[in-house]
Regions:
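Active-site beta-loop-alpha junctions of metal-dependent nucleic acid enzymes
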Residues: 60-64
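Active/ligand-binding-proximal structured segments within catalytic/core domains
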Residues: 34-43, 143-144
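Generic short alpha-helical segment signal, independent of protein family or function
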Residues: 2-5, 20, 43-48, 76
Length: 223
């Protein structure tokens, strides 16, 4: 039970990324971290039942090595797809739609809203949070995963394999995702550019997210 529980504003800190830019983190209080951990114990098993099969980040018994192995499995054969869409989501954690989370995450909505709207303190000033789930929150990785889950099924449903003996055809669509980084394979550059990418953009827009035009690219595996 909530029993009048109200989370405190997050403490904003910045860490430097490899490219020299700063990544903002929102650090909850110890009490808020404990409450998030408690609710995560109930939410995590639910998240596992709806997770994409080839999602590897922030999941028990999965690692970057597993994601790399799956990429190898998808691309190593002579009959494997030759083209890859490398997806980069702009500030994924910072821009997830609060409305989407409140409509789709199966947990106490009042408490989830309080966590999302708790704001953060920086330089002794309180700032509101209108979107996103803070990097630094214990429950945030699972919320981000649940936001992005469903893309693999959408791609499979949109680009089915024709298994007819006379007209066998496969678009060679495979998704491998680690947290907010992902690749999608395809039989041609045109398929990825004209059909797959617009579908991904639409999927992300519904969740308040966008692809980075600068960092998202389509490449041949030999490049």
């Amino acid at each position: 039970k909530r029993r009048g529980y109200t989370p405190q504003p997050l403490r904003r800190v910045h860490i430097r990324k490899r490219n020299g830019k700063l990544r903002p983190l929102g650090i909850p209080t110890m009490k808020d971290r404990a409450m998030q951990a408690l609710y995560l114990m109930a939410l995590a098993p639910v998240a596992e039942t709806t997770a994409d099969a080839n999602s590897y980040g922030f999941r028990k018994e999965r690692s970057t090595a597993d994601a790399v192995q799956q990429c190898f499995n998808d691309l190593a054969r002579t009959t494997s797809p030759q083209w890859i869409l490398e997806g980069d989501i702009k500030g994924c954690f910072d821009h997830i739609s609060h409305e989407w989370l409140l409509d789709n995450i199966p947990m106490d909505k009042v408490l989830l809203r309080k966590w999302l709207k708790s704001g953060f303190i920086f330089n002794k000033q309180l700032f509101p949070t209108e979107e996103g789930t803070p990097q630094g929150g214990i429950i945030s990785p699972t919320l981000a995963n649940m936001t992005l889950d469903g893309l693999e099924k959408l791609l499979a449903d949109s680009f089915p394999i024709n298994r007819s003996k006379k007209n066998y055809y496969t678009p060679m669509i495979n998704l491998v995702r680690y947290a907010d980084d992902f690749i999608i394979t395809g039989e041609s550059k045109e398929l990825l550019e004209n059909h797959v990418k617009p579908l991904v953009i639409e999927f992300l827009q519904a969740r308040g997210l966008t692809l980075s035009e600068e960092k998202t690219k389509i490449t041949h595996i030999e490049e």
